[in-house]
């Protein structure tokens, strides 16, 4: 029987499947951070259980860390306690930890792939909704809750029901200045923020195959923002080139064996999907969100829609509420909207390719008066690579703040946050009410669009560079 990539990955990891029970899957990799793990470790301790396979669990500190200092006390007592608990738990249970002073420390969904911890064909879980990022490598990766974190620590398994399958094909070539962020925002704009609920989504098509691994990670990172359980891209030569030689990647003969297996990880030509969505890549323009979920998005050359334009009463009410929160009027263009802050970073867009794209826009320009712009690399290795290329100097000379690795302003769990009423051009993944700080207003964009907004003090269409001041 023909199978989709998701079905192949799922079936390869079944430990136990019996009638009237949710199948039990084996988990190859478990990623842990300081926020969703303390109660799970406490549960193990209370029950007297060890971590079943500590060598398959990797931990880092990212959500609560300061991006201005390595001082564990910098972000307050709760952050300090959570990080201290993670250090204690990893030491006690024998888990590898990339702590604040480790050169590999960074955002969990950045360090997994760059260290080769993430490999094609794996099942990967983390107590974080954006675990879908790792699906860019053809691995089945999804976020789990704290009780499930404990279950995986204790057994290296997890009960997981089969999901429906969705194929999203992006046909043709994208235009100039169009990035993976624009592609995925355009997809979510078409499906809506709940269009993928109950599905595992496989992204394919010429435009997807042309993406770098960084771009594919951006794409899969936001699969959750359309409601999907996970996102997938079939591994190919781009994947293998990226993986070769990384710390935890197979070496020598094992590498050749691994690649031979990885090449089988693709949907069969006659595989059946529950739903198919097609997008014409040539029609995708630079995207900017206007509302309070990622599906409320428009092309930069479009006007903000009126609530009356939505036939669905729920969508209409959501649009009315979003416009009120964002203090925007229907019918205007986002190029007319001034911004206060710019955030370039997050597990969506903090990799070296993202920073290069932003630096290319920033070079030779200055951040607009009254705008604060921060650039936060996703990991220690990304920071080191960017500094070796001189990107930090480009940003600093342009008036951007160059920070230390961490989740930063993606979420209001550290010192980087918006004040009430502040408007931010952000390369992160969520524009919910209060996501970046109570009363803060978030517009999701690509790194290049964010850098251009910082320079101009408002959004511009980066396809027309003459707009850059």
Curated annotation (Swiss-Prot):
One of its GO terms (biological process) is L-leucine biosynthetic process. Its cofactor is [4Fe-4S] cluster. It holds the Pfam family Aconitase. Its EC number is 4.2.1.33. GO terms for molecular function: 3-isopropylmalate dehydratase activity; 4 iron, 4 sulfur cluster binding; metal ion binding. It is an enzyme of class 4 (lyase). It comes from the Bacteria. Keywords: 4Fe-4S, Amino-acid biosynthesis, Branched-chain amino acid biosynthesis, Iron, Iron-sulfur, Leucine biosynthesis, Lyase, Metal-binding. Catalyzes the isomerization between 2-isopropylmalate and 3-isopropylmalate, via the formation of 2-isopropylmaleate. NCBIfam families: leuC, PRK05478.1, PRK12466.1. This is 3-isopropylmalate dehydratase large subunit. The gene is leuC.
């Amino acid at each position: 029987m023909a199978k989709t990539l998701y079905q192949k990955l799922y079936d390869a990891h079944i430990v136990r499947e019996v009638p009237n029970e949710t199948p039990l899957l084996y988990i190859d990799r478990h990623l842990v951070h300081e926020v969703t793990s303390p109660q799970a470790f406490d549960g193990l301790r209370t029950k007297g259980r060890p971590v079943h396979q500590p060598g398959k669990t990797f931990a880092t500190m990212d959500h609560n860390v300061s991006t201005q200092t390595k001082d564990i006390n910098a972000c307050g007592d709760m952050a300090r306690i959570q990080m201290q608990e993670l250090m204690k738990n990893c030491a006690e249970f024998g888990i590898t930890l990339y702590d604040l002073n480790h050169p590999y420390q960074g955002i969990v969904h950045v360090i997994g792939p760059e260290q080769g911890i993430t490999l094609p064909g794996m099942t990967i879980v983390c107590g974080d909704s954006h675990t879908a990022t790792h699906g860019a490598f053809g691995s089945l990766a999804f976020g789990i809750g704290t009780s499930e974190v404990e279950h995986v620590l204790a057994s290296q398994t997890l009960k997981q029901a089969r999901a429906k399958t969705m194929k999203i094909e992006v046909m043709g070539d994208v235009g100039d200045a169009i990035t993976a962020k624009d592609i995925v925002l355009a997809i979510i704009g078409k499906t809506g923020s709940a269009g993928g609920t109950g599905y595992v989504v496989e992204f394919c098509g010429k435009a997807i195959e042309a993406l770098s691994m960084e771009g594919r990670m951006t794409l899969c990172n936001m699969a959750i923002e359309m409601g999907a359980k996970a996102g997938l891209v079939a591994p190919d030569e781009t994947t293998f080139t990226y993986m070769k030689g990384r710390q935890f990647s197979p070496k020598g003969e094992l590498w050749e064996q691994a690649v031979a297996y990885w090449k089988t990880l693709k949907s069969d030509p006659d595989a059946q999907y529950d739903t198919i969505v097609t997008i014409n890549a040539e029609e995708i323009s630079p995207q900017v969100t206007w509302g309070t979920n990622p599906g409320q998005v428009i092309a930069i050359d479009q006007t903000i829609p009126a609530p009356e334009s939505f036939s669905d009463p729920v969508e209409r009410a959501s649009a009315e509420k979003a416009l009120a929160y964002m203090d925007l009027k229907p019918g205007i263009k986002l190029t007319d909207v001034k911004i206060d802050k710019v955030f370039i970073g997050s597990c969506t867009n903090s990799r070296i390719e993202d920073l290069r794209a932003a630096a290319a826009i920033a070079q030779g320009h200055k951040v607009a008066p009254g705008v604060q712009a921060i650039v936060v690399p996703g990991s220690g290795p990304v920071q080191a690579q960017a500094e070796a290329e001189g990107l930090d100097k480009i940003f600093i000379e342009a008036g951007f703040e160059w920070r230390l690795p961490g989740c930063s302003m993606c979420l209001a769990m550290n010192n980087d946050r918006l004040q009430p009423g502040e408007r931010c051009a952000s390369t992160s993944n969520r524009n919910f009410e209060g996501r970046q700080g109570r009363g803060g207003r978030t517009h999701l964009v690509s790194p290049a669009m964010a850098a251009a907004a910082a320079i101009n003090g408002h959004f511009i269409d980066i396809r027309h560079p003459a707009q850059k001041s």
